[in-house]
């Protein structure tokens, strides 16, 4: 599910084909290892490179890394287990190796030489990933932000123009949100925004994308036609109406949806969905409207 929030930016497991370990492998070129590990800012690629180096020089056929925020895996998950703790940027990490055979004293020394080389490139990659996430996602709701939305909508509309599937856009707005903020304060308002983000997140499908683009305005890019967008609107309105806090504070939502045509640009699709949203508000709010020109 891509809300632009993600969840994780990278998959937990990343397998990388390695050269088979040979007891006659040449000595480790530590300078070359450093260069290889610094070649990427993708944590999974850095970790896969680390695993490949280990597999070439030591009887290691798999390694996993785990911290509070990261899980990375390379190679096989069976063998003789060896667990080690390292500190990366002040964060404790657990490395669990899967060995073909127990390490000899010289092999243990080799591992101790290679292991510290992982820390700085992995820390760089993790920090870059975190900055990328912050640049793409709304801090309050965890949904995509305006910048991520703009790029995603252009890409989605381009696919529709190439006849690679239907794309619709839903524009959502909270009813009575300003009154809530004025009466109960911004802390309460932030709580409602976060809860609404959770409602959207739990309502959309894995192929849809949700964003908060400002204030109490949200959008959803739907991979489907106007009827698919309508079903999603129904789920969101129903979930909002049955949410205790929304009922308590007198907040509801209005939605408008439109489907992209082969000749429509991204901004035109937004304008059509936004126009339909205001038709929903004019109809009494707490409802949704679909672009009438696209219903058949």
Curated annotation (Swiss-Prot):
<keyword id="KW-0479">Metal-binding</keyword>
<dbReference type="GO" id="GO:0043709">
    <property type="term" value="P:cell adhesion involved in single-species biofilm formation"/>
</dbReference>
<protein>
    <recommendedName>
        <fullName>Diguanylate cyclase DgcS</fullName>
        <ecNumber>2.7.7.65</ecNumber>
    </recommendedName>
</protein>
<dbReference type="Pfam" id="PF00990">
    <property type="entry name" value="GGDEF"/>
</dbReference>
<dbReference type="GO" id="GO:0005886">
    <property type="term" value="C:plasma membrane"/>
</dbReference>
<keyword id="KW-0547">Nucleotide-binding</keyword>
<keyword id="KW-0460">Magnesium</keyword>
<keyword id="KW-0808">Transferase</keyword>
<dbReference type="GO" id="GO:0005525">
    <property type="term" value="F:GTP binding"/>
</dbReference>
<feature type="binding site">
    <location>
        <position position="216"/>
    </location>
    <ligand>
        <name>Mg(2+)</name>
    </ligand>
</feature>
<dbReference type="GO" id="GO:1902201">
    <property type="term" value="P:negative regulation of bacterial-type flagellum-dependent cell motility"/>
</dbReference>
<keyword id="KW-0342">GTP-binding</keyword>
<feature type="binding site">
    <location>
        <position position="174"/>
    </location>
    <ligand>
        <name>Mg(2+)</name>
    </ligand>
</feature>
<feature type="binding site">
    <location>
        <position position="173"/>
    </location>
    <ligand>
        <name>Mg(2+)</name>
    </ligand>
</feature>
<dbReference type="InterPro" id="IPR043128">
    <property type="entry name" value="Rev_trsase/Diguanyl_cyclase"/>
</dbReference>
<feature type="domain" description="GGDEF">
    <location>
        <begin position="165"/>
        <end position="293"/>
    </location>
</feature>
<feature type="site" description="Transition state stabilizer">
    <location>
        <position position="178"/>
    </location>
</feature>
<comment type="function">
    <text>Catalyzes the synthesis of cyclic-di-GMP (c-di-GMP) via the condensation of 2 GTP molecules. May be involved in the regulation of formation of solid surface-associated biofilms and pellicles according to environmental conditions.</text>
</comment>
<dbReference type="GO" id="GO:0052621">
    <property type="term" value="F:diguanylate cyclase activity"/>
</dbReference>
<dbReference type="InterPro" id="IPR050469">
    <property type="entry name" value="Diguanylate_Cyclase"/>
</dbReference>
<dbReference type="InterPro" id="IPR029787">
    <property type="entry name" value="Nucleotide_cyclase"/>
</dbReference>
<feature type="active site">
    <location>
        <position position="216"/>
    </location>
</feature>
<dbReference type="InterPro" id="IPR000160">
    <property type="entry name" value="GGDEF_dom"/>
</dbReference>
<dbReference type="GO" id="GO:0046872">
    <property type="term" value="F:metal ion binding"/>
</dbReference>
């Amino acid at each position: 599910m891509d809300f632009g929030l993600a969840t994780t930016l990278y998959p937990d497991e990343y397998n990388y084909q390695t050269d088979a370990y040979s007891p006659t492998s040449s000595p480790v070129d530590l300078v070359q290892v450093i260069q290889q590990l610094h070649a990427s800012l993708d944590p999974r690629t850095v970790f896969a490179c680390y695993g490949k180096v280990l597999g070439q020089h030591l009887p290691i056929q798999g390694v996993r890394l785990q911290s509070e925020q990261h899980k990375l895996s390379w190679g096989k998950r069976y063998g003789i287990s060896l667990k080690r703790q390292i500190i990366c940027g002040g964060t404790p990490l657990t490395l669990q190796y899967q060995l073909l055979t127990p390490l000899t004293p010289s092999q243990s020394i080799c591992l101790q030489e290679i292991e510290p080389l992982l820390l700085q490139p992995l820390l760089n990659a993790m920090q870059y990933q975190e900055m990328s996430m912050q640049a793409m996602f709304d801090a309050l709701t965890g949904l995509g932000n305006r910048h991520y939305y703009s790029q995603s909508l252009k890409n989605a509309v381009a696919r529709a123009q190439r006849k690679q599937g239907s794309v619709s856009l839903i524009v959502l707005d909270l009813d009575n949100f300003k009154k809530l903020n004025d009466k109960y304060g911004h802390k309460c308002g932030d709580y409602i925004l976060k809860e609404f983000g959770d409602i959207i997140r739990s309502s959309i499908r894995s192929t849809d994308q949700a964003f908060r683009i400002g204030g109490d305005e949200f959008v959803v890019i739907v991979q489907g036609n106007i009827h698919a967008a309508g079903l999603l609107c129904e789920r969101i309105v129903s979930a909002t109406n049955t949410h205790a806090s929304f009922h308590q504070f007198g907040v509801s939502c209005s939605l408008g949806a439109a489907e992209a045509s082969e000749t429509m640009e991204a901004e035109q699709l937004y304008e059509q969905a936004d126009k339909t949203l205001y038709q929903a508000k004019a109809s009494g709010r707490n409802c949704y409207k679909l672009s009438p020109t696209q219903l058949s």
